[in-house]
């Protein structure tokens, strides 16, 4: 009986520790205030390029990184990586496939993956027109310890341009934000 109680206690302690783990971006747990998280990004070599509505934009090597926090800025809950826009379908797909392969190697098969461009022609113009119209569905997601990671091809603000986007969402802090928002309505 004593062994069973000890085993159950250890099991619940391990589950509790796992449940409290935050998702990380570039080795930085997605937690804490906007200021704290951004300081950690700066120490990793990112450069701040602006802040608006609790979304801070940083620039890294080939991408812009957005950090999203609660309205009061006290709790970071998501990080979004936006790769440079492109008007070339092959560039978008090659970037998407490269990161999909990396994440699959690290986290295993995606929890969900759908890749469809409904263009009837295989020309760059036809493919990018579908991106521009928002009819392309190209995305994969991984449920990982502490949250989820989503990879997708999205329409960008330029005409016939798209971009690859990676979203990191910390499940604990997303849930805390939702609870705060529910309290406000």
Task: Report residues per predicted region.
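N-terminal, post-signal-peptide region of Sec/Tat-exported proteins
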Residues: 41-78
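Short, compositionally biased strand/turn segments
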Residues: 77-85
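Sec-dependent N-terminal signal peptides
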Residues: 4-15
